[in-house]
C-alpha cells in the first residue's frame, strides 16, 4: 500500500508545525475559469477550450445580435491566422455564475476597440458569451 503519510515538523524556534489540511492543498491547485480560459486560449488548445464550454454554448455578436455556436467559435479561436492583441486585460468580476472582463483589443486590421465581455457559466462551463465594444482612435 503506497501513499503519503503527513508528519509533523519542527519549525522556527522548535515549534511543531502541523501539516496543512487537505482542503487547503486542494484549493491551491484549483484555477479559476478565467485562468483556465486564458491558458487554453493563449495555447490555441481546442480540447481545453471545448472542455470549458457547455455543448449549448453560444457567442452573441454585439454588432448584430447574431448567435454563433460553439464549434464555429472554437474554429475561430484556434485558427493559425493573425490574432487580436489584448491590452490592459482585467477581470472585473468572477464567481460560479458569471465572468465580467474588460480589455482594449487591437485587431489585425488595425482597428482598436474597448471591449466589455460577459460569460455566463452553468455547472462551471461557459454557456453564453457576449461582448460590447466601443471603437477607439487608432
Show where each model-derived region lies:
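A beta-strand edge to alpha-helix "cap/lid" segment located at domain peripheries
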Residues: 22-23, 42, 60-64, 71-138
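Generic alpha-helical hydrophobic packing signal
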Residues: 30, 36-37, 50, 67, ...
Amino acid at each position: 500500500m503506497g501513499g503519503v503519510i503527513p508528519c509533523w515538523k519542527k519549525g522556527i524556534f522548535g515549534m511543531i508545525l502541523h501539516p496543512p489540511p487537505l482542503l487547503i492543498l486542494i484549493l491551491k491547485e484549483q484555477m479559476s475559469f478565467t485562468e483556465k480560459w486564458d491558458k487554453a486560449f493563449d495555447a490555441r488548445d481546442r480540447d481545453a477550450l471545448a472542455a470549458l464550454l457547455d455543448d449549448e454554448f453560444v457567442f452573441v455578436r454585439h454588432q448584430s445580435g447574431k448567435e454563433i455556436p460553439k464549434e464555429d467559435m472554437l474554429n475561430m479561436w484556434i485558427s493559425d491566422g493573425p490574432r487580436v492583441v489584448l491590452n490592459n486585460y482585467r477581470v472585473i468580476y468572477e464567481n460560479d455564475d458569471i465572468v465580467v472582463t474588460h480589455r482594449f483589443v487591437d485587431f489585425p486590421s488595425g482597428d482598436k476597440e474597448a471591449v466589455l465581455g460577459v460569460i455566463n457559466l452553468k455547472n462551471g462551463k461557459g454557456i453564453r458569451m457576449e461582448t460590447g465594444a466601443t471603437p477607439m482612435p487608432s
